[in-house]
Amino acid sequence: MSTLPAFQDEFDVIVVGAGHAGCEAALATARLGCRTLLLTLNLDKIAWQPCNPAVGGPAKSQLVHEVDALGGEIGRVSDRTYVQKRLLNASRGPAVWALRAQTDKREYSAVMKQVVENQPNLLVREGMVTDLVLDANDTVIGVETYFGVAFRCQAVILTTGTFLGGRIWVGNKSMPAGRAGEFAAEGLSQTLARLGFEVDRLKTGTPARVDRRSVDYSKMEPQPPDEQVRWFSFDPTVWVERPQMNCYLTRTTPETHRLIREHLHLTPVYGGWVDAKGPRYCPSIEDKIVRFADKESHQIFIEPEGRNTPELYIQGFSTGLPEPLQLQLLRTLPGLENCIMLRPAYAVEYDYLPATQCFPTLMTKKIQGLFCAGQINGTTGYEEAAAQGIVAGINAARFVQRKPMITFPRQESYIGTLIDDLCTKELREPYRMLTSRSEYRLVLRSDNADQRLTPLGYEIGLVSEAQWQVFQAKQRRLAAETQRLQTTRIKAHEPVGEAIVTATGQAIKSAIALEELLRRSGVHYELLDRHGLGNPDLTPQEKEAVEIAIKYAGYIERQQREIEQIARQEQRPLPVDLDYFAIPTLSMEAREKLSAIRPLTIGQASRIGGVNPADINALLVYLQVQQQRQSLTAVGG
């Protein structure tokens, strides 16, 4: 803007959007001592779950544990508002175990609203930001709202979700909206484009909701909760067990598939009205029928939206078909033959900024002090949003306080993997976190997220002194228990030794340490408990953590060595102002990609699409030659 507006108030940081990214970002900056303003279109929809009311799942649960370990909120609120919890992939190794909580969506929003509204240093208010105020150096110094109110600040975090230029579709009918019943954010996309950002479109969708009083559960397969409740948070003060509810499983039928195939042309994508890319790993039901034409049936999960609402979420059944057809489709599912639809499914397309325009700190490359987090960066999922939110919040606070910003290496956390992928790879579809995206998943488990990240959270000031004491006490217990298991031995001829041989079917030669016993296949800590050899002072989670560390010690040590070896080369910094076009040994594609993305390290450069190993070698040789020339110049001078 050419002339500065009259600022109504001044803050250190302004966060635009109060979804899952925005709440984590605002809480982080406020807790780190920044006076923070959190602006939202609707104070009654803070941390709303517009799609599935659930947190966690494969790879996503690891993100939640990591955010919690850093001092974030998503895990704590999920633990306080769950209606069902299950451990997914329990029959596989601990690297891919995934805790998933079905949450009460209204309670979740209310609890998070209470948290942000009672956070010191944080003001939450309504407002639609349409413009950014920059100084002469293209550094952000404020925002302006649709109704002309301006606020001064030193940093802005954009966490706008699906609201930027949002448009929802049901069949060929559409309207401007960020979510059903909520108007879209207008103006900010145009501002960002005017400032030189690349702005593109993505699409997502949500299924219909039906009235649970109209559903016949006897025709479905119950999906009960786990008997042993597990927790996202490492803070025992939020571990309150509550009554749980069942989810249910039904399946599509030949009639479902027939109706979809006959009416594909009526959907926004197949009808040609929307060409934005949707999420590959959360496809619409019509995409499933087209892409997996040989499959006779698809699983559909029926999930409660809360304890005190009749609404059921029909997971796996999002669609862009017209509303009258949606009811016909729903009634082809066993158990839903007489269902009443309370809300139709819809698709939503929205603007986003490809995240290659951000540094791994999540600050944009074009504008100092401007950060982006969540769906505006091209991700899908509450957990991915929360992870980016806390990183953007940490770094916005450090930017304001003139402290060095923090980059999360991909080999140390799923958060690091997520952000490295976003800032390095050219993604043209909504990005979802998967365990397969991490090369280091055996080390990056849920159970050790606090060991990996809580020291950092404490060092930067996000983890409180009380939380730090809880963490340290836990580490002391784990160390003491590991030592006890190493030194406690049982003899084959003793009654307990004979009982264990009988229980496991595995012989004990003369005597065996409990640690060695736990290393054996099929032997778990519960066996020690059963025979009076366990430690009653440990929580179930701590017993599990000790067992994993012992049972997989060899694999973990090997992966740790690989990480250290790779890190030595990966972390080699690249000059921010390096002229890649002046390096003739690089391919032209590599020069273009490296110039556009401007990676901070050799490791990041190696993961850019179009940059091959030969280019990395050429880059290393060039840097070596430049370093030698500088050394010679220094000696000669």
From Swiss-Prot:
Its main location: cytoplasm. GO terms for biological process: tRNA methylation; tRNA wobble uridine modification. Signal peptide: none annotated. GO terms for cellular component: cytoplasm. GO terms for molecular function: flavin adenine dinucleotide binding. NAD(+) binds at residues 278-292. Its cofactor is FAD. PANTHER family: GLUCOSE INHIBITED DIVISION PROTEIN A, PROTEIN MTO1 HOMOLOG, MITOCHONDRIAL. Belongs to the MnmG family. NAD-binding protein involved in the addition of a carboxymethylaminomethyl (cmnm) group at the wobble position (U34) of certain tRNAs, forming tRNA-cmnm(5)s(2)U34. This is tRNA uridine 5-carboxymethylaminomethyl modification enzyme MnmG. It comes from Thermosynechococcus vestitus (strain NIES-2133 / IAM M-273 / BP-1). The lineage of its organism: Bacteria, Bacillati, Cyanobacteriota, Cyanophyceae, Acaryochloridales.
